[in-house]
Amino acid sequence: MRTQIKCYSIVLVMVFSFAIGPAFSAEPTITVWKSASCGCCQRWVDYLQDDGFEVIAHNVDDVVSIKKKLGITNPALYSCHTAKVGGYIIEGHVPASDIRRLLNEHPKLMGLTAPGMPQMSPGMFSIEPKGYDVLQFNAKQETSMFSSY
């Protein structure tokens, strides 16, 4: 009888582990603010979704005001869209692999930026990043290299 109860207990634990495991391992949702008329912004959103992220995209008339509300005041960091994930700000065409690395390492940063609109970046003219840098920035908006492609 006790052996039978142990077996049922093990089975129940396994079932619940498989059922709720993905909920705990899922990546946080990325919230994106972008212009409705910007095709590369939508392609970056699509790229992130294809890479497994859940993305909530907001079309806004003034993306710069969103950047400022989030605390990005240095125009040198700006790109065409702004995102927030896991407490970090993502500015521009940052590759999904860099976002995952940021979320896994949890550095004391404000976020990542791919300033401007790098031509060979996800959402622009390439899925594989080439020929540009992704910078990390702190609350003082001082930058240093995060990744180079």
Model regions: which residues?
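Loop/turn elements at helix/coil->beta-strand transitions in domains of secreted/extracellular proteins
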Residues: 27-29, 53-54, 78, 108-110
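Bacterial N-terminal signal peptides
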Residues: 9-19
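Thiol/selenol-based redox catalytic cores and closely related redox-interacting motifs
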Residues: 76-149
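Mature soluble domains of exported/periplasmic/lumenal proteins and thiol-rich metal-chelating peptides
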Residues: 35, 61-66, 117-118, 124-126
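N-terminal, post-signal-peptide region of Sec/Tat-exported proteins
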Residues: 45-92
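Bacterial N-terminal signal peptides that target proteins for export
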Residues: 1-10
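Local sequence-structure signature of Cys/Sec-based thiol-disulfide redox active-site neighborhoods
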Residues: 25-51
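Short glycine-enriched loop/turn motifs at secondary-structure junctions
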Residues: 24-25, 84
